[in-house]
Every structure is written in structure tokens, then in C-alpha cells.
Amino acid sequence: MAQMYFYYSAMNAGKSTTLLQSSFNYQERGMTPVIFTAALDDRYGIGKVSSRIGLQAEAQLFKADTNLYQEIAALNEVEKRHCILVDECQFLSKEQVYQLTEVVDKLHIPVLCYGLRTDFLGELFEGSKYLLSWADKLVELKTICHCGRKANMVIRTDEHGKAIKEGDQVAIGGNDRYVSVCRQHYKEALGK
């Protein structure tokens, strides 16, 4: 029976690497997965999912107004899809997460979503909030803080490496803008 999975973590835990490995596993068995990624995240090129260790694959883009159920149903009509993989799923809307539940429940295709749980202020992203609520399986991927403890928070930094305490929830960046830390070092960095 198809299920929806939410693989979540702080930055640099290997979410994209895990997604790409899952895609490879399906392909190795003669199955056809489809990868989606957020159109607004073009750090590694448009329509690509890339990992820090150099793995890469082409991806379909989703925008704020993309109807994922319709897109996936249309793709599935052309060629049977065995798995849907969604990178940067924190950028999904509530409606898009619901559409993915419909993919699982009506099309009977497993959906594996990979993304951040919280932003640099410790607040849930909309997509993450509804994935935490509606996913069948929650899987935490782990990374470590500079102190060696599990990192479960993300700090956004300025050009001098200082923690930023306000700003837009979405600001695309990588290691140049974000640092994954444990809760204690998150609070210390923000002066809490």
C-alpha cells in the first residue's frame, strides 16, 4: 500500500543525497520515479536536484501555483510512475501537500518528501507543518553541530558570520548563509 513519507532535518544532513539514492534504487529495479523540486531554489541550476557530494538528477519544477496531483496524474497517464520524490518540500503549500496525499490515496503511488522542518527563526515552514500532520511516516535525518551534538536548528548568518534574528522566511542559500546547530548553540547565537 502506498504511503507518504516526510524525511526532515536541519541543513547538511544529506536529504538530497538520500532522495537521489532512493531514485537510483527504483531505477535499478526497472521502475520509473519522478523527482520534483522547488522552482525558487536554483542554487545548482534550474530543474536539478544536487547533493553536496556531487550527485545530481533532473527534476520537474513545482511553483506556488502548481497542481501536483494534476501534474503527476498526467505523467502517470503517459508512463506508469512508481514513486514521487519531492526535494525542498518545505516550500510546498498546504494545498500542495494535500494534493500529494491524493496521489498516495487515489493513484496509489508512494510519495517521499525531503526538506527542512523549521526556518532560521525556529518556525515551521508551511509545507513542513502539513507534512508533519499528514504524512504516514516521519523520518528524521541527522546531522551534527560543531559541538558534536545533534543539530536540529538552523542559523542564518550575515556576511560576517553573525546570526540574523529577523527577515523573510525564505532566502535561498547554502553553507555561505546557513549553519546547522544544536538548540543550545542556536539560543546562544540568537542571544536567547
From Swiss-Prot:
Binding site for ATP: 9-16, 87-90
UniProt subcellular location: Cytoplasm
Alphabetical list of InterPro entries matching this protein: P-loop_NTPase (IPR027417), Thymidine_kinase (IPR001267), Thymidine_kinase_CS (IPR020633)
Residues the entry annotates as binding Zn(2+): 145, 147, 182, 185
Signal peptide range in chain numbering: none
Domain of life the protein comes from: Bacteria
GO biological process, one term: thymidine metabolic process
Entry keyword annotation includes ATP-binding: yes
Keywords, ordered alphabetically: ATP-binding, Cytoplasm, DNA synthesis, Kinase, Metal-binding, Nucleotide-binding, Transferase, Zinc
Gene Ontology cellular component list: cytosol
Enzyme Commission numbers on file: 2.7.1.21
One Pfam match: TK
SUPFAM superfamilies, alphabetized: Glucocorticoid receptor-like (DNA-binding domain), P-loop containing nucleoside triphosphate hydrolases
Catalytic machinery residues: 88 (proton acceptor)
Keyword hit for Nucleotide-binding: yes
Coiled-coil portions: none
Reactions accelerated catalytically: thymidine + ATP = dTMP + ADP + H(+)
Recorded GO MF terms: ATP binding; thymidine kinase activity; zinc ion binding
Main subcellular localisation: cytoplasm
Subunit structure: Homotetramer.
Family as reported in the entry's similarity comment: Belongs to the thymidine kinase family.
Protein's name in the database: Thymidine kinase
Gene from which this protein is expressed: tdk
